[in-house]
Each structure stands twice: as C-alpha cells, then as structure tokens.
Amino acid sequence: MSVKNILFIDSYYNSLYGAQKSMINLALQLQEKNINVTIASMHSGFLLEEARNNSINTYSFNFNPNILKSEHQYSGLYQKITFIFLLFFSWIRAFILHFHKLKTSDVICVNDIRTFLYLFPLLMLTRKKNIW
C-alpha cells in the first residue's frame, strides 16, 4: 500500500513546543516526498496557524473548549460527570461532522493521549492505520 495522505492530530491547539514543532518539521519533510500531509487539531490556535504559515494543510475539529481543559479542572464529581457527557456528545458530533476527514486519510498519526481519548471511537471505526 502506497501512503498518499497522512493526517497528524494534536489536541494541544495553542501550543508550539517540542512535540508540535517536531510534527510540523516531519510534515514539511513528508511534503518534500510528495506525500499529502494535513495537520489537525481539536480547535483552532497557534498550532494550525504555524502549520498554515509553513504551507501545510490544516484541519480543525472545533471541539468544545470546555472539554479541552486540563485534567486538574475536572477535580469534583460534577466536573467529572460533565466531562463524560461532553466527551460523549463530542464523539457524536465528530462522527457526524468529521468522520469523512479521518476516513480519507491513509494513515492517522495521533500526537498525544488526549487526542486518542477524544477521537477513540472514530479512530477505531476508520479501520485505517493509526500511529501513536
């Protein structure tokens, strides 16, 4: 199987640290080898802006910002229940709006554990090669 479309996904949409910079550098090198690369994130932010500045295709899943909060903000029982409901409805919304984007990629590279959690059902349904 010849890889033609690679989708990189990272949930840290407003970060440009080591992992995100490495992902952008790898995407640029793959583009030089005529591989179609897209960098996606859970929401628009610095990561997608930097990818666009480097002429890399971008895609935003536009997840609810409340679900993208850090773990310590879900310390109480109410917050944990809210998170579970938000996650469930985000899965449904992502399936309806974004499943096609995942399905058209030959390889899906997940850059962090949060992304894997946020997109777990969709990643399994695509039956595509998933790299973490």
Regions inferred by a protein language model and the residue ranges of each:
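N-terminal strand-loop element at the rim of the active site
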Residues: 10-16, 29, 33-84
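A short, glycine/small-residue-rich beta-strand->loop->alpha-helix junction that serves as a flexible
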Residues: 10-24, 113
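Short His-centered aromatic/hydrophobic patch
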Residues: 90-91, 110-116
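Active-site proximal beta-strand in glycosyltransferases
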Residues: 107-112, 123-132
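Short, well-ordered alpha-helices that flank and scaffold nucleotide-derived cofactor binding pockets
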Residues: 24-28, 32, 121
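Short, well-structured alpha-helical segments in soluble
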Residues: 94-104
